[in-house]
Each structure stands twice: as structure tokens, then as C-alpha cells.
């Protein structure tokens, strides 16, 4: 097996073991910082909606930003939009950085450096690639936290006692890519 294939297999196995460990750790992770961002997003969206006389809020979206893995900002974009999601400017945009990603990136780096015996002579660029591969796998964890935070804000706080039709659709996915609907519990 050539070095590139060996490296890819190693990074994927490393990501799988790391994510398996972290899912249990983060599934009960507090979502207050994300909830605050969602609340601010919705408040800004309502203000913009009144200012623009725009349609009602139709979507709340969390976008995964691949560029943030390269810039090491580890940001996720939150958008509130009306029906014209990609056509017009969104009603509101905010960014959320999970407080655990910077620390995890450092731990991943340390583990990759310590495990150089498995892939000898990992360059700095290859270590950075390994960090990106592992953190890309955090999307599942972020999706769990997103669902939990959105349910709290929409169903327990801002949209409590509202008809289900009044609650905007909640989506998640790659920026300018495929989006998935998040089914939220409204009870």
C-alpha cells in the first residue's frame, strides 16, 4: 500500500475512534452558547423582517463551513431566512464556534504527533490534514447539539404555545450544498 493510501486509512480509523469516544462525551454537552446565538439570530431576523417588510421567517439553518477547518476558526454559520433562501440576502447571519473545538484540535495534533510510528515522517501539512479529517467528523456531534439547542429555543422559549405551522423549518448541511431537514419535537 502506498503512503497516501496508508495515510488516508490511518486518518479515517483515527477519526472513527475519536468520534466514537467523543459522541458519548458530547451528547449531553451544554448548549447554552448555541442557544444564545440562535436567540440573537431570531431577534435580528425579526428586526430585519420588519425593516425590509420581508416574508415570514421560513428557515433556520446551521451550515458547515469547510473553509473554517482550513483557517482554524472552526466556525459554523447560522442563518435565518425567508422563503427565498439562496436568492435574497438572509434575514440574519451569525457564527458559532463550539468552545471544545480548539481544545480538541490541540489534543488531536498531540495524538497525531505521538502516533508518528504508525505513519512515519508525518509532515506539518499532513498533521493539519489529519486534524481537518477528524474535525470534519464532528459534524454528527454538531448536528446533535444543533437539534437539542433549536428544540429548546423554538419549542420551549420563543415559539412556545404556537401552531406548528408558525415554527420555521430547521435545516443543516454544507454551505451552498445539500441541506437536510431536522425534525424537531414540538411537545
Place the predicted regions along the sequence by residue:
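Short N-terminal helix-initiation segments at or just after the protein's N-terminus
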Residues: 1-12, 107-117
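Short secondary-structure junctions and interdomain/linker hinges
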Residues: 45-52, 115-122, 126, 149, ...
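Aromatic- and glycine-enriched beta-alpha-beta binding-site module
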Residues: 51-108
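Low-complexity, serine/threonine/proline-enriched polar segments
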Residues: 91-137
Amino acid at each position: 500500500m502506498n503512503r497516501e493510501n496508508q495515510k488516508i486509512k490511518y486518518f479515517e480509523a483515527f477519526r472513527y475512534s475519536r468520534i466514537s469516544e467523543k459522541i458519548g462525551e458530547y451528547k449531553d454537552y451544554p448548549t447554552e452558547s448555541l442557544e444564545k446565538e440562535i436567540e440573537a439570530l431570531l431577534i435580528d431576523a425579526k428586526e430585519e423582517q420588519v425593516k425590509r417588510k420581508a416574508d415570514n421567517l421560513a428557515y433556520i439553518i446551521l451550515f458547515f463551513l469547510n473553509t473554517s477547518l482550513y483557517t482554524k476558526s472552526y466556525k459554523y454559520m447560522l442563518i435565518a431566512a425567508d422563503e427565498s433562501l439562496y436568492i435574497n440576502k438572509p434575514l440574519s447571519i451569525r457564527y458559532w464556534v463550539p468552545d471544545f473545538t480548539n481544545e480538541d484540535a490541540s489534543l488531536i495534533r498531540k495524538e497525531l504527533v505521538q502516533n508518528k510510528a504508525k505513519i512515519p515522517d508525518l509532515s506539518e501539512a499532513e498533521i493539519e490534514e489529519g486534524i481537518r479529517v477528524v474535525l470534519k467528523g464532528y459534524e454528527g456531534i454538531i448536528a446533535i447539539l444543533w437539534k437539542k439547542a433549536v428544540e429548546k429555543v423554538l419549542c420551549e422559549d420563543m415559539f412556545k404555545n404556537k401552531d406548528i405551522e408558525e415554527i420555521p423549518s430547521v435545516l443543516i448541511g454544507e454551505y451552498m450544498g445539500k441541506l437536510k431537514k431536522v425534525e424537531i419535537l414540538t411537545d
